[in-house]
Amino acid sequence: MNLEAFVLGCGGMMPLPHRHLTSVLLRREGELFLFDGGEGTQISIRRLNLKWKKITAIFVSHMHADHVTGLPGILMLSSQVDRDEPLYIFGPPKLADYIEQSRRSLDMYINYEIIVSEITEPGIVWKGEGFHVRAFPLRHTKTCYGYAMEEDLRPGAFHPDKAQSMGVPRGPLWSVLQSGNDVRLDDGTVVRPEDVMGPTRSGRKFSYLTDSLYFPDVSREVAGSDLLICEGMFESALLPSAIEKKHMTSAQAATIARDAGSVRKLGLIHYSPRYTERDLKLLLDEARAIFPDTVLTRDRMDFPIEYLD
C-alpha cells in the first residue's frame, strides 16, 4: 500500500517566489489528506498533477493566515471537478467561522458537503481503513495542534515452511491464514495464524508539527515516526526570538526527533523569510549535528514512506 508525503509549501510567515506557505499533502492508496493550506497550495497541487477531488480531509494546525489563506481557493475549485463526496475539515476554534465567512463573503458556489469539526481536546480525530489521525496540543500564540497519521498493526510475516510442515498445502488456505483466520485440515487438525506467522509488525507513521515553542514532552507524540515534518524557523543564534514568537530553531526540531526515538527522517519546514536558499544550509547543519537524518524540505518535494519490513 503506497504512502507518500508531498511538501506543497515550505515557507513561513510570507510567501516568496520560490517558497509557498506551509502545506503538506499525504497520499495513502489514492486518498489525499491535506495538512494546512497556506498561500500557494493550489499551485503546487496543480504542478504535481494531484487530484482535487481525492482530498478526503484537511487538518489545520492553527488560525494564522500563513496556514489557511489557501483554503478558500481549494474549496471553490473542488466544485469544478465534479466532487460528490463530503470534505472533512478539522482544526482549532474559529475554523468553522472562517470557512463559513469565506463562503458567504466570496459567494462561493459549493456543490458538495463541507463538514467542519473544531477540535476541543487532543485525541483521534479521524479513522480510516487501517489507520487513524490523532491531534496533539502545541504551544503557540493561539490554540494550535500537531497531527500524527498512524497505521494499524500489520500481521506478522507468513512462513510457508511452517505451513507445509503442519500439513497446510500451498494454495487458498495460505491466504486464509494470512487473513487472520484458522484453517481446519481434512484430518481435523486446526492450524491457527500464530502457528505459521511471525509477530505483528508496525504500520507506518507520519507526523506534522508546526508552529510551536519547543517543549520536551512533544517528543512522545511523534515517537516512531517514519517521517516527521517539523518547523525549523530559526537558527540557534536567534533562540530568544524563537521563544518570544513561540517558534522553534532547527536544532530544537532535531532534538525532538532525536529524543522521540525511532524517527527515521526529519524534514524541516516553515522557514523564516529572512533566510535565502544559501542561508538555509545553516539551519540544516545545526539540525544534522543533532539528528543526522534531516533534510531541508522544498516546495513540491515528495517523500515515499516505505515499510521497514
Regions found by a protein language model. Name each.
Residues P15-P17, F131-Y208, S212-E221, L227-I229:
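Active-site-proximal loop/helix segment associated with metal-binding centers of metalloenzymes
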Residues G70-L77, S102, T276-D285:
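Metal-dependent catalytic neighborhoods of phosphoester/phosphodiester hydrolases
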Residues P122-G123, Y214-D309:
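Binuclear metal-ion centers of metallo-dependent hydrolases, dominated by the metallo-beta-lactamase
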Residues F35-G38, I55-M63, G91-P92, S207-S212, ...:
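Active-site neighborhood of phospho(di)ester-bond hydrolases with catalytic His/Asp-centered motifs
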Residues E39-F90, E118-T120:
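Active-site metal-binding motif and surrounding structural segment of the metallo-beta-lactamase
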